[in-house]
Each structure stands twice: as C-alpha cells, then as structure tokens.
C-alpha cells in the first residue's frame, strides 16, 4: 500500500511554500510539525504492518531539498517511522521520490528503508553505483515512454532499464519511474 511520508504530509497540511520558508525562519515549529506528521504516518501504517502488508512511502515534495536539508528535515522522521514499524514486525519500507534526485541518493540508506523507487530522471547505473550495495532499487521506465511510446519502444525501454539494474547487489525490480499515466493505452 502506498502512503505519503512525513515531509509530504506536513507540506499537505501547511502548504509547500510555508514549509520551505519555515526551513529558514521557523525550524523549531517545522520540526514540531514534522514530528506530528511522523506520528500520523506511524499510526496510519499500524494496521498494515500488523497484518504484514508491505508499505511504500512517497515523498514527492522532498525532491526540492538539498542533501543537507534532506538530512535535517526528512531522515530523522523516517528513522522514527521505520523504528516503530520494525518494533511491530515490519521488515522495512520502500520509498519513492520524484524528480532527478541524484544529489540525494547517498542520503537514502540513512533512512532505515529497504529499497528506493527512483524516477526516470535518475540513471539506474548511477543509483546502483551509489546505493546498490545498501538498498534494493526499483524503477525506472519513463512514464512518458509508457504513455506515448509504441509497444516496441516501450519493450526496448524496459530492456535498457533492466540491463542497467539487473545485477544490483540488493535486488532490482523493473517498474515505471513514477505512476503509469491514466491515459496509457491497454495495449
């Protein structure tokens, strides 16, 4: 099941602009909100964890951050969520983040997650080199290719993606780089 992570939950509650301004002007208030958002994430996930249903957390808003900001405003709250879920029997969670997050890749193993789903903007070979020994990688066939491509070009995109990631030490799963667009042909 997919849930929003603490940072995006906080951004949905307060607004992205307010969150970004608070990172400079009201860190204490933002940390309180993020702690609250982490508590929400923990409780929303409780029944899924207790029933051994896998959870993937998404943080589309966090792609706006620098590695330093990510370490301060995202990672501590993921660690809090993962630690609690692991107490309840979870083996960990997957994580998806939108956009070109190459600059953030090296921070992901600090989150306590099992794997990362990366957007098509990130080169799988680079992700594998940076975090493949610590995390499973999922991705990252272009949703635009899936929407607009021919069956042959989509197949080639899947093959190209697989060739880059199949030997990731912690595992690799072929998947779209983000959602499959709703207008995608069933063909």
Predicted features and spans:
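Active-site loop segments of alpha/beta catalytic cores
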Residues: 1-187
């Amino acid at each position: 099941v997919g849930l929003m992570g603490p940072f995006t939950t906080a951004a949905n509650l307060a607004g992205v602009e307010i969150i970004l301004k608070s990172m400079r002007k009201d860190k204490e208030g933002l940390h309180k909100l993020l702690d609250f958002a982490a508590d929400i994430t923990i409780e929303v996930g409780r029944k899924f964890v207790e029933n051994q249903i896998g959870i993937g957390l998404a943080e589309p808003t966090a792609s706006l951050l620098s590695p330093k900001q990510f370490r301060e405003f995202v990672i501590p709250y993921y660690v809090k969520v993962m630690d609690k879920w692991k107490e309840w029997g979870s083996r960990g969670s997957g994580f998806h983040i939108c956009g070109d997050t190459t600059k953030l890749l090296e921070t992901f193993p600090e989150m306590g997650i099992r794997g990362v789903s990366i957007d098509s903007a990130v080169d799988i070979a680079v992700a594998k080199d940076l975090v493949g020994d610590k995390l499973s990688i999922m991705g990252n066939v272009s949703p635009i290719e899936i929407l607009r491509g021919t069956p042959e070009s989509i197949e080639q995109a899947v093959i190209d993606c697989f060739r880059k990631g199949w030997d990731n030490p912690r595992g690799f799963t072929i998947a779209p780089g983000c959602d499959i667009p709703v207008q995608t042909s069933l063909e």
